[in-house]
Amino acid sequence: MDAIIIFLILFIVGVLIGVGVYYYKEKERKKTYKIIEMEIIENLKELKPYVAPDEGREYTKEFDLVEIALSYDIEDIIVVNDEGLVIATTLKDADEVGATASSIFEYIKKLCGNIKKVVIFKEDSYLYIYPLKLYGENLYVIIESKIALDVIEEKEILKRITGVLKKYFSTITTIEQEIPEEALLSI
């Protein structure tokens, strides 16, 4: 009988020690995660001036282009037609930037001939201007980034932007198909 009582006492003590060790290790692991989390936050604070969007700008509520911009650390994406009118953007006040960038591209195209893109290095950012032809429309994609984009990223970004623009243009063609021609003639 004494052996059973001693066994039970030792068993309970062993379980309590095991649970105590488990909670101690768990507490240490959480402390380690907290330290790592604080280090990451500090490092992100150091990186913020280099990749964070400008706080003085107002962004649109359209999430298609904003999602692309966030996934590639891009500040702004503006798509304009050949007249400089904004088609899609991540900014609310992109009219002036879009018109200026499209005219810059046209001016450089007159000087240099057949060009694929224009890259302007500003004080703290890069401005990329790409020509794009979609459904017979001449468009310009203007990308502002605090980091330089490599060629692979550029192609991926332009491919995703083209996918978003196809949604916009498919909506327009669907609307045109739904409106009878008599209604168009009366306008």
Swiss-Prot record:
One Pfam family named in its UniProt record: Robl_LC7
Coiled coil feature spans: none
Keyword rRNA processing: no
Membrane topology: Single-pass membrane protein
Keywords: Membrane, Transmembrane, Transmembrane helix
Annotated transmembrane regions: 3-23
Localization, UniProt: Membrane
GO cellular component terms attached to this protein's record: membrane
Protein name, UniProt field: Uncharacterized protein MJ0163
Taxonomic path: Archaea, Methanobacteriati, Methanobacteriota, Methanomada group, Methanococci
